[in-house]
A protein has these predicted regions:
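A generic structural signal for solvent-exposed, polar alpha-helical segments
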Residues: 12, 25, 83-85, 117-119, ...
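Disulfide-stabilized cysteine-rich extracellular repeat microdomains
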Residues: 39, 82-85, 105, 131
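A generic structural motif
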Residues: 29, 37-39, 72, 80, ...
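Low-complexity, Gly/Ser/Thr/Pro-rich intrinsically disordered linker/tail segments
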Residues: 143-155
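Residue-level preference for alpha-helix termini and adjacent loops
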Residues: 31-33, 82, 128
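Surface-exposed, glycine-biased beta-strand/turn segments
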Residues: 1-63, 93, 106, 152-154
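Zn2+-dependent peptidoglycan hydrolase active-site motif and core
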Residues: 44-84, 110-112
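Conserved, short, structured surface segments that act as functional micro-motifs
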Residues: 63-69, 89-146
């Protein structure tokens, strides 16, 4: 399996609606809401390919982006004010892909909604996903062989 490092989609750690609250309300797109003003930079959570750019805020999701990652996971970024990537574009973790906003018919204020979807199409809790990803990264680092990390010097 391919290991892909994930990072949060914006600099703020302040959230106002978590995955459990979305599920309890019966949200069709559960995820995590980051409190941030309109115009805040939104970053790609991981390397991948942009597979959806929806610039028409015609429904509850508003202006949105979806990225498919090499491990089969997808990240969705909703309620954006501006998209800064194109469908089919390759992105790297940390690239600015959009600006946050308050678009969509169900939005109550400016924020960034992040959904994470596994390779089977199931929504997963972004907080738990980030925690699991950090643990996997540490485990991989701990099992790295010294030969792979130590430079070779000639006598």
């Amino acid at each position: 399996m391919t290991f892909v490092k994930y990072s949060p989609p914006c600099k703020t750690k302040d959230t106002n609606d978590d995955f459990k609250a979305h599920v309890a309300r019966g949200s069709s797109i559960p995820g995590l809401d980051y409190n941030c003003p309109t115009g805040t930079k939104v970053f790609a959570c991981a390397d991948g390919e942009v597979i959806v750019t929806d610039e028409v805020a015609k429904d509850g999701t508003g202006i949105s982006i979806e990225i498919k990652h090499p491990d089969g996971m997808h990240t969705r970024y909703l309620h954006l004010s501006k998209i800064q990537v194109k469908k089919g574009q390759k992105v790297s973790r940390g690239d600015t892909i959009a600006l946050s906003g308050a678009t969509g018919t169900t939005v109550t204020g400016a924020h960034l909604h992040l959904s994470v979807v596994d390779k089977h199409g199931k929504f997963v809790d972004p907080d738990k996903w980030f925690d699991k990803n950090k643990k996997e990264e540490k485990a991989l680092a701990a099992t790295a062989t010294p030969e792979a990390t130590t430079p070779v010097t000639e006598a």
